[in-house]
């Protein structure tokens, strides 16, 4: 029966320690690689998420631009329609005022013509004494009354 201390081979405890140390180093190296791989994967997922968010933001921006353009076009069309209605109303107002003013002028003209017809006496009914005290100078008015109409445009 031999004693263990008399053996001439390498120390088994030292070999066991070295083996455990190598195993711990391998596990540590493996953990570092797993951690690095996790960081790379997290970074890549972040890149993909940011890319997706950028695409979504650009699409939302395009939709907003389209919508603003559509709203502006509708506003412009409404303004043009209102302007057309305003112009038509103004033209109708001017025409109506013109017709009424012309009607008033015609009414005034007719009244003057009727008044002149009352004042005109036929020539055969005038018997003037040319000698003596009564001398009347009578000028026969023309068939049309003389008056001037001034039309002012605004």
From Swiss-Prot:
It comes from the Eukaryota. The lineage of its organism: Eukaryota, Metazoa, Chordata, Craniata, Vertebrata. Residues 89-118 form the IQ domain. InterPro entries: IQ_motif_EF-hand-BS, IQCF. Signal peptide: none annotated. GO terms for molecular function: calmodulin binding. This is IQ domain-containing protein F3. SMART domains: IQ (SM00015). Pfam families: IQ.
